[in-house]
């Protein structure tokens, strides 16, 4: 999906995203107006297809990973998981699912495989 922000921000104004349904994450490339990459943002998600409605439901599992052009990797919003668990918004099963997906995502990020997985989507749409 190619997109523009409703209100351009100082950091970025547009991007492109690709959802890996079977793996449980969406990777987005955030860019400035001139096309310069600001960072890549990886949302860990749960996806559910409702056949009778022909509709996909995506649920954000809170923890995200940012990958900067320098190669620096930042895991963000981890504290939100504890808050959501304490308040009953998510259960232990969802936290386990999130941790398994985070582990697999970090494995492909640190190995560099994410670049090969996204190249065709980001290069042709950027």
What would you call each of these model-derived segments?
Residues 61-105:
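A hydrophobic, small-residue-rich beta->alpha segment in the mid-to-C-terminal subdomain
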Residues 101-126:
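Cysteine/selenocysteine-centered motifs that mediate thiol-based redox chemistry or coordinate metal-sulfur cofactors
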Residues 6-9, 52-53, 84-88:
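A short, polar/proline- and glycine-enriched secondary-structure boundary/capping micro-motif
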Residues 1-15:
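Charge-rich, low-complexity N-terminal segments
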Residues 17-63:
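Structured beta-strand/loop patches that form or line metal/cofactor-binding pockets in enzymes
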């Amino acid at each position: 999906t190619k997109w523009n922000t409703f209100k351009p921000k100082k950091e970025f104004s547009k991007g492109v995203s690709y959802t890996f349904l079977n793996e449980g994450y969406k990777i987005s490339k955030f860019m400035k107006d001139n096309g310069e990459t600001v960072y890549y943002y990886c949302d860990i998600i749960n996806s559910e297809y409702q056949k009778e409605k022909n509709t996909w439901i995506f649920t954000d599992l809170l923890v995200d990973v940012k990958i900067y052009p320098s190669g620096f990797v930042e895991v963000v919003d981890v504290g939100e998981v504890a808050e959501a668990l304490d308040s009953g918004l998510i259960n232990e099963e969802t936290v386990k699912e999130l941790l398994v997906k985070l582990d697999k995502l970090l494995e492909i990020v640190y190995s560099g495989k994410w670049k090969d997985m996204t190249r065709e989507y980001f290069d042709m749409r950027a």
